[in-house]
Amino acid sequence: MQQDSASYAGQGATILESIGTDLAGGYLRKVEDLVVADVFGDFLDMAEHLLAAGYFVPAAALVCAVLEDALRRLCSRNALMVANTDDLAALNNRLASKKIYSNIVRKQVDFWSAVRNAADHGRFPDVKSEDVHAMHQGVLAFLADRLG
């Protein structure tokens, strides 16, 4: 029986060693990124279907939810502190102030944030279909450029 226990302990140590190697090599991080990309790809696909059906207000909320998560991940990848209470504007300003991306990108993200805020707070006349379509395409490009 002790031999079996020693064998299990050895197998456990081998598994832990393997996990440590994967962590050190960044492989588990890459798997997490793949899962996140798949989930948010689904969200962006849903937004695209909403846009095609004329439901651009909820599409704006979905697209910017993906964008906000992407900004959090970008902050994390660049060792910038992020609080749970940080909103899209705070994340955007932090990234731009640290020169992670340009002021032009910051202004674009500010515009997308304003569109989302109008959608989220019932200012529907301020939400234009063409702005949400452009935001959807812009966020796709942003994700490919910054997190791809």
Model-derived features: positions:
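A structural signal for well-ordered alpha-helices, especially hydrophobic packing surfaces
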Residues: 13-23, 51, 70, 116, ...
